[in-house]
Regions:
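Cys/His-rich short segments
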Residues: 73-137, 148, 254
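Gly/charged, well-structured mid-domain segments that form the phosphate/adenylate-handling core
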Residues: 118, 131-133, 164-200, 204
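Glycine/charged-rich beta-loop-alpha catalytic/anionic-binding loops adjacent to active sites
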Residues: 139-147, 192-197
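Active-site beta-alpha connecting loops in nucleotide-dependent enzymes
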Residues: 185, 203-277
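Flexible active-site lid/hinge loop adjacent to a nucleotide/diphosphate
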Residues: 2-101
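Short, basic, glycine/proline-bearing loop/turn elements
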Residues: 18-24, 196-200, 229-235
Length: 278
């Protein structure tokens, strides 16, 4: 809302709405209000929304901007029960509890409201045939995408990029080549070696992100050591209460020889693991 008075974007991508560093950003409703104000300031701006996220979809429907959706219309994981914290548990239109035909993680999935009929929209960019073995691979609108990334959430990231590029008229014949040349940012699925030992470094600052990092660990059945470093510097977020919303229970099945905690708030992390008998 501070930037939009100076220029009007042609496109906006809404990826998801998760709680993140509450001491800095506040609750999701504050973020949604800011985004809604921004969208009203650029009424001709085209919005590409993650249709699997009920909050992002509601935000698009509640404004008058032209919009389209991307998402993953088929079930990838078979888990029925989860301890994950879901945002948007209740319909933003009528207040009824949301139901799911299936979900992917957090509140992302094939949702619908039994009260007013609000549901996941049709997907203009639909990721299908998702394969998470040896990197990630999937199809979108007949185009096969293969990338040497880990983490199911990266399917959403790549779908968003593909959809935005398509809407903007960018040629896509070299899309896979561009993905292959991209180097992940520091802490984002970063791979390196220390004395011949392979290391993967992942950053997380909210429950949804940490749960996805744990999911990535769980896809590797080989023996491993896990190190969890928690800080509370201003750039990290000083409130670490969100650790109690992460599903650390799953790490008991991670085939880990050791789990080490460190950082300024290592004792908070140690206590959190104690409560799941780790």
């Amino acid at each position: 809302v501070r930037v939009f008075p100076h220029f009007k974007p042609d496109y906006m991508v809404l990826t998801n709405l998760f709680r993140d560093q509450l001491d800095r950003y506040g609750e999701i409703d504050i973020t949604m209000n800011l985004l809604s104000r921004a969208m009203k300031m650029a009424p001709d701006m085209k919005v590409l929304v993650n249709g699997d996220d009920s909050l992002s979809t509601y935000l698009a429907m509640d404004n008058e901007n032209p919009w389209s959706a991307y998402g993953i219309s088929t079930q990838v994981f078979q888990e029925e029960n989860t301890k994950e914290i879901r945002e948007g548990r209740f319909c933003k239109r009528c207040g009824e509890k949301m139901e799911y035909n299936f979900y992917h993680y957090s509140q992302l999935g094939d949702y619908y409201c039994p009260g007013c009929g609000f549901k996941r929209p049709s997907l203009e960019f639909d990721g299908t045939n998702v394969d998470l073995n040896d990197g990630i691979a999937f199809d979108v609108n007949g185009f096969h995408i293969k990338a040497n990334y880990r983490g199911f959430y990266n399917v959403y990231n790549i779908l968003a990029v593909y959809g935005a590029a398509s809407l903007a008229g960018v040629p896509l014949e070299h899309f896979n080549e561009i993905l292959g040349n991209y180097k992940p940012q520091f802490g984002r699925n970063e791979l390196f070696q220390i004395s011949g030992t392979k290391v993967m470094l992942n950053l997380a600052k909210n429950p949804a992100g940490f749960n996805q990092n744990i999911a990535a660990v769980m896809t590797d059945s080989s023996p491993k050591d896990i190190i969890i470093l928690i800080n509370d510097n201003s750039q990290d977020g000083t409130d670490v209460s969100w650790l109690w919303d992460v599903d650390f229970d799953r790490l008991k099945d991670a085939n880990a020889a050791s789990i080490t905690v460190c950082g300024l708030r290592c004792q908070d992390m140690r206590l959190r693991l104690k409560y799941v008998d780790i």
